[in-house]
Each structure stands twice: as C-alpha cells, then as structure tokens.
A protein has these predicted regions:
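Conserved acetyl-CoA-binding loop-helix of GNAT-fold acetyltransferases
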Residues: 158-175, 186
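Non-catalytic substrate-recognition and accessory regions of acyl/acetyltransferase enzymes
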Residues: 1-158, 176-185, 199-271
Length: 271
C-alpha cells in the first residue's frame, strides 16, 4: 500500500470513527465523490491548502490527519491527544450539516491549527501556540509575544474541575513536548468571557467561574453569542422567528430582540 492509499484508508477510518457515516447515511466513497478524484493532489501538497469547496475541504482535513499522526509519532505525542484533537473535524462537519444539510466543512481555516501541530485538545479545553495579536500594557504584554490561547469546543459543560484538569495538563504538556516554546500567559478571546452574559447565566454558573480565571484586558462588540447559542449561520432578521430549545436560548433571544449588545472579551491568565 503506497502513501496515498494509506492516507485514504486512514481518512475512511476517521470518517467512520467520527460518526460521519451515521450523520450522512452514506459511506466514505459515496459521500466524498467527486472530491476523491483530488485525493492524490491534496495529499502530495507541501502545505495544507483549503479549496473553499466544503466537500473537498472535509476530504483534505481527513487526509491530512494521517500526516498529522506521523508528526505526533515523531514528536512522541500521546495518541489520545491526537484523536481528541482531530475530533473537531467531525464537530465542524456536523455543524455545517446542521444548518446547510450538506456534506463538508465551512470553517476549514480554523482546523489548520489542529492539522499543523499548533493546537491540542487536553481534556475539556483546547490549547494553541500562537503569538499575541493584542497588547496588555499593565502586564508588559505586546503583540507578537508567544502565548497559549485557550479554546472551548462544543460538547460538554465548562465544569470547573474539568477545566482545572485541562490547565494542569497544559502546564505540563508544553514544557515537556515543546520546551523551546517559552510563554508567560494563557489567553482566551471568547464570547464566553462577556460579563453581559452574567444576568442570563448567574454568578454561580460554570460560565461565570470560567470568566473568573482570566484578567479581562479588552472586548469588542460581537454577534458570536447568537451564532454559538442559537444557530451558527443565524442572521439578525432571523432571530425573532428562531424557536428556542432551552432556557439559555430563550433568554438570549429576548435580550437580542431588545437590542442588547454582546461582546467577545479577551482575557489572560499567568502560566
């Protein structure tokens, strides 16, 4: 079996392991034709490139997972971290399916971090090595300083104990596996750090406890809360007709219809 055949075989296995066969009710070949005709070209490329076609990009993510596994093995990174990290492919494929009814990926650029050995899922949270794109003068932090950014993938609550365990793993993981990557801070840029949410979720909620981990150093107006809580592709003129499925959605819808502004906030946490 040559390298391309191995990559296609691995992609097929991941397609099934991540539940895409059940989601689409189609096997690997049926779901990804005609994109499969480009498999060799995608796999042989020196760098990961996204085509902009959702189906082709899903195939690219699955094929490059096999290259990523080779990188993990060279760096002696745990298999468990590899599989948890690339599970995000299935999450984003499911997200795209939920609002479009189509096979593919719409947020493929985000997965570049996973597939190029920069982002790792360590328990509940994801951690990504990247330079700061903001400043925090009171902390002596300038743009370009190496950080480890924190991301919260869909699936599961923000249980404080689970988050504690993730941070503990990250504090051990990066010095062990990437000792040359010196960083002083974790950072997080998220709608979940928006204090405007507190009247909706309460001060004793998991979201509130997560916010309290960070020193907030900035915020920008954003519709991210509507996208993550209501529907990923929702437009402002569609909010009134949206049917809430839970209390949080109902409360957020009410606030959005009253013209409440929500934000994405940036916070930092000392390593």
């Amino acid at each position: 079996m040559n390298n391309i055949e191995q990559a296609i075989s691995f992609a097929r296995q991941e397609y099934t392991r991540q539940g895409l066969d059940a989601l689409y009710q189609k096997d690997f070949e049926e779901a990804l034709l005609p994109a499969l005709s480009q498999a060799a070209e995608i796999y042989r490329a020196d760098t990961l490139r996204w085509s902009g076609d959702p189906k082709t990009d899903l195939l690219a993510a699955l094929l490059w997972s096999q290259k990523l596994l080779n990188d993990y093995q060279r760096h002696q990174l745990p298999d468990e971290v590899f599989y948890h990290t690339i599970d995000d492919i299935g999450r984003w494929a499911s997200e795209y399916w939920s609002y479009s009814g189509k096979i593919g990926l719409a947020e493929s650029a985000w997965l570049t971090n996973h597939l190029t050995l920069r982002l790792f899922q360590l328990g509940r949270l994801q951690f990504c090595m990247e330079p700061a794109d903001f400043s925090a003068p009171s902390f002596g932090l300038e743009p370009g300083e190496p950080l480890v950014s924190v991301h919260i993938c869909r699936g599961g609550s923000l249980d404080p104990a689970a988050c504690d365990a993730s941070f503990a793993r990250a504090r051990a993981f990066f010095p062990k596996h990437f000792p040359a990557y010196a960083f002083r801070f974790f950072s997080c840029h998220s709608w979940l750090l928006d204090e405007t949410l507190l009247p909706l979720v309460g001060v004793y909620s998991n979201i509130s406890f997560f916010q309290q981990r960070f020193q907030i150093v900035g915020r920008t107006a954003s519709n991210a809360a509507a996208r993550y809580v209501l529907r990923w592709d929702i437009q402002p003129d569609e909010i009134a007709a949206f049917i809430p499925q839970n209390r949080f959605q109902s409360q957020l819808k009410t606030q959005l219809l009253s013209q409440q502004q929500f934000y994405e906030a940036t916070g930092i946490l000392a390593r």
